[in-house]
Structures are given as structure tokens and as C-alpha cells.
Amino acid sequence: MRPLTPRQAEILELIKRNIADTGMPPTRAEIARRLGFKSANAAEEHLKALAKKGCIEIMPGTSRGIKLTQENTEDADLGLPLIGQVAAGEPILAQEHVEQHYKVDPAMFKPSADFLLRVRGDSMKNIGILEGDLLAVHKIQQARNGQIVVARVEDDVTVKRFEKKGNKVFLHAENEEYSPIEVDLANQSLSIEGLAVGVIRNGDWQ
């Protein structure tokens, strides 16, 4: 199989997770919404590229007409991908970020988890998110005040409590030793990579 671009790998992982969670593939509109595309047409172009590379089959005439090839059907049974160090500028679910897969049922979290992120540092220790824990993350592009999010500020990925005030976003630590990260949306880049939906204590799942 020809190598995938980071974005193609991210879409393929989303398809696998949706099938694992719901028993069916996502629609083009759902892919576009989950990954922040402006239209379903953008998702369609990526799906065509995945089909050309032998990862999926596209069945015309239905909004969920996406079928994993046998190789990728087997991969979908591996479990949730564990994301380690995230390279600057790369999609968080790019294949090179996946350290391994864990046999965890995504549906045990509400909403269901799309991936696990290895926690680095102690900035969220006061709410029980500790160094080395595996944070279960539901991939979504928007957040409400008070939610714990995985956010990308410029090229750095961080786990913090989200608060938006006007044109500014404050990312709050749950550790008094850390000051909030202030992001001025007028001149700084911020994107939400997902919502924290649970924690697996380091060592609980091997």
C-alpha cells in the first residue's frame, strides 16, 4: 500500500473508529465536521485518494458508502491508538504519532473516545490527570467553557481547562504552580483537537 499523508491517515483512523463505535462508516458531512473541513466535498477528495491507495472502497449512491479493505478491517480491531509526542504542524492522528494500540472499548467513555493521549507533566494533577496517564479523547473541533480539552496553540499541544472571553481564550491548568495560557485569537493560532472524556491510570492497561 502506498504511504498516506498525515491527513489521509487521520481520516482513515476516523473511519475505523466510527465503524468500531457505531457499526457503520461516517458520512462525508460527519468527516468534514469532525476534522474541520469547510465542506463535504473536501472530505470526498480525501476519500478518493484513500481509495486509490487501496485503503478503502467507495460504494456510490449512499452517504455511508465507505468500506474498509481487508487489511484495514483487521487494523480496526487493534483498539484505540495511543498518541505520544506530536510533531509540530502535523495532524494529531498522523500514523507516525501512534505508539501502539490499546484494547479499550471506545464506548466505555461518553462521548466515545477516538484516541488516547499520553499525559506529560503535572499541570492537571489537581483533577487526577497525572504524568504518564492515558487521556481518553473524543475528537471534536469546538469546546464550551469549563471543559477539559486537548488544544493546539501555535505548534504546541496541551491539555487544559477551556475558557473563552470575547476574542481571547484562557487555558487553565489544574495546578496552582502554573499560570493560565492566554491566547489572543486576533494574532495567535489555536485549534481544539478533542475533548477529554476519561483517564486510564498508567499501568492499568498493558
Curated annotation (Swiss-Prot):
DNA-binding region in chain numbering: 28-48
E.C. no: 3.4.21.88
GO terms (BP aspect): DNA repair; DNA replication; negative regulation of DNA-templated transcription; proteolysis; SOS response
Pfam family, one: Peptidase_S24
Keywords for this protein: Autocatalytic cleavage, DNA damage, DNA repair, DNA replication, DNA-binding, Hydrolase, Repressor, SOS response, Transcription, Transcription regulation
Gene Ontology MF terms: DNA binding; serine-type endopeptidase activity
Catalytic residues as annotated in Swiss-Prot or TrEMBL: S123 (for autocatalytic cleavage activity), K160 (for autocatalytic cleavage activity)
This protein's record includes keyword DNA repair: yes
Site (Cleavage) residue list: A88, G89
Domain of life the protein comes from: Bacteria
Catalytic activity of the protein: Hydrolysis of Ala-|-Gly bond in repressor LexA
EC class name: hydrolase
PANTHER family: LEXA REPRESSOR, LEXA REPRESSOR-RELATED
Family membership noted in the UniProt record: Belongs to the peptidase S24 family.
Subunit composition and interactions: Homodimer.
Entry function: Represses a number of genes involved in the response to DNA damage (SOS response), including recA and lexA. In the presence of single-stranded DNA, RecA interacts with LexA causing an autocatalytic cleavage which disrupts the DNA-binding part of LexA, leading to derepression of the SOS regulon and eventually DNA repair.
Entry-linked HAMAP family: LexA
Name used for this protein in its record: LexA repressor
Native source species: Shewanella halifaxensis (strain HAW-EB4)
Source lineage: Bacteria, Pseudomonadati, Pseudomonadota, Gammaproteobacteria, Alteromonadales
